[in-house]
Amino acid sequence: MSYPQWPGQLRDGLAAMNLSLSDSQQQQLLAFLALLNKWNKAYNLTAVRDERVMVSRQLLDSLSILPWVTTDHLLDVGAGGGLPGIPLAIVVPEKRFTLLDSNGKKTRFLNQCVLELGLDNVEVIHGRAEDCQPDQPFTQISSRAFTALENLVTWCGGLLANDGEFLAMKGQYPDDEVAALPAGWQVESSHSLTVPGADGERHLLIVARAERHR
């Protein structure tokens, strides 16, 4: 279920992003993409079905936030098809990743990825964010194509450390979502993401409690 142009697209994209990965890491990324492409036909894991753009819109897009992933243990909420969690876990195996999703089909896919790709640094949890009870709160929580910012902080705020931050991946800058953030939350910074081969705007919003740096 792979596409002949994927290896070249990945190499070129990584070079454009100044990311140096081993051959085995690149093979893992492509194996993950093949799994996603295969399972997507039955499980509807992602809206991206054009094999020509999967490397850029799924792998490279996920890796575009890597410079902002500073925690040793990242929670990826609404993990769905494993984006950005699985690509990040492949690229930084020294960090731990917890992937949370309430859809049983999606978590079955994620568990299969962990098994087939040998990702010892990934844990998959089937459940809702509101019901999740981690041993300790997370300092960073990522979100991609999950929900509006208002819902993100409402549903997942209890999982975030007081001084933690959300890494919210968006397309166009979501002015309406930012305006609707509940009191006590703010966008600390916004970063325009450059994803080789992908059309359209991409933004990363760093969202945190307003009192974080007081």
Swiss-Prot record:
UniProt-listed Enzyme Commission number(s): 2.1.1.170
Catalyzed reaction equations: guanosine(527) in 16S rRNA + S-adenosyl-L-methionine = N(7)-methylguanosine(527) in 16S rRNA + S-adenosyl-L-homocysteine
Disulfide bridge positions per record: none
Cellular component aspect of the GO annotation: cytosol
Keywords, ordered alphabetically: Cytoplasm, Methyltransferase, rRNA processing, S-adenosyl-L-methionine, Transferase
Signal peptide positions on this chain: none
Domain of life: Bacteria
Primary subcellular site in the record, as a coarse category: cytoplasm
A Pfam family annotated for this UniProt entry: GidB
Residues noted as binding S-adenosyl-L-methionine in the record, renumbered to the chain: 78, 83, 129-130, 144
Subcellular location: Cytoplasm
NCBIfam families: rsmG_gidB
Role: Specifically methylates the N7 position of guanine in position 527 of 16S rRNA.
Membership in a protein family: Belongs to the methyltransferase superfamily. RNA methyltransferase RsmG family.
PANTHER family for the chain: S-ADENOSYL-L-METHIONINE-DEPENDENT METHYLTRANSFERASES SUPERFAMILY PROTEIN
Record protein name field: Ribosomal RNA small subunit methyltransferase G
Native source organism of the sequence: Marinobacter nauticus (strain ATCC 700491 / DSM 11845 / VT8)
